[in-house]
Design a protein with these regions (language model features):
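A short linear-motif detector with a strong N-terminal bias
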Residues: 41, 71-74, 123-125
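Signature for the C-terminal beta-barrel architecture of outer-membrane proteins
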Residues: 58-60, 80-183
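Beta-barrel outer-membrane channel/assembly domains of diderm bacteria
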Residues: 1-69, 92-99, 138-139, 182
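"Short basic amphipathic alpha-helical interaction patches in structured regions
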Residues: 37-40, 76-82
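Gram-negative outer-membrane beta-barrel proteins
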Residues: 16, 29-35, 70-75, 113-117, ...
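Generic secondary-structure boundary/loop-capping signal
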Residues: 66, 73-74, 79, 86
Length: 183
């Protein structure tokens, strides 16, 4: 089989206004998996990234929207670019960067829902319902060290024999912490 991923990326950078925008569209398919006329399959082309980054000061910025997150070797939070479709996150990330002391800190939040409603609803997709993380990185003269803490909330059904309603759903949180030193 032949698997294909095609991406087109656009970016806009306005240093005077301290704004950066990025967008990536992608098409992932296996050759021959759809009709050649392909008028019925509407799931091939998708938005992989669509984000904006605002610099508040010399040290602080925030990046909001659908974006790739990739920290250290990508094992805890990564773009998994080894898979054809890759991975992006709907998140807001507050970033701190001090080039003098070589310190980076990223604090991110994500909250997923299936529709545009103010009411609480069942989230039965196989993604996190809520996610929070903090990544600390420091470059020293001879090595680079970082630590990542992730709080991941997955929604689940309490009693599978009962109807799937919001009262029969809970969020289970798991915490993961990991570090990396590169010499």
């Amino acid at each position: 089989f032949i698997s294909q991923r095609s991406r087109i990326s656009l970016s806009y950078n306005n240093p005077a206004k301290k704004l950066v925008f990025g967008a990536t569209l992608q098409d992932v398919r296996t050759w021959g998996a759809t009709d050649q006329a392909n008028i019925g399959d509407k799931n091939n082309l998708g938005v992989h990234e669509f984000w904006g980054n605002i610099m508040f000061s010399e040290h602080f910025s925030t990046k909001v929207g659908r974006q790739e997150l990739n920290y250290d070797n990508g094992r805890i939070i990564g773009r998994v670019d080894w898979s054809q479709q890759g991975r992006s996150f709907d998140a807001a990330v507050l970033k701190y960067l001090d080039t003098t002391s070589q310190i980076k800190i990223d604090f991110g939040l994500g909250y997923n829902t299936k529709s545009q409603t103010l009411l609480q609803e069942v989230y039965d997709l196989n993604n996190y319902k809520s996610m929070q993380f903090i990544w600390l990185n420091k470059k020293f003269k001879s090595f680079n060290a970082s630590i990542l803490f992730l709080n991941n909330g997955l929604e689940y059904t309490v009693n599978p024999t009962n109807p799937i309603t919001i009262s029969n759903r809970k969020i289970a949180y798991s915490q993961t912490i990991g570090g990396q030193v590169r010499i």
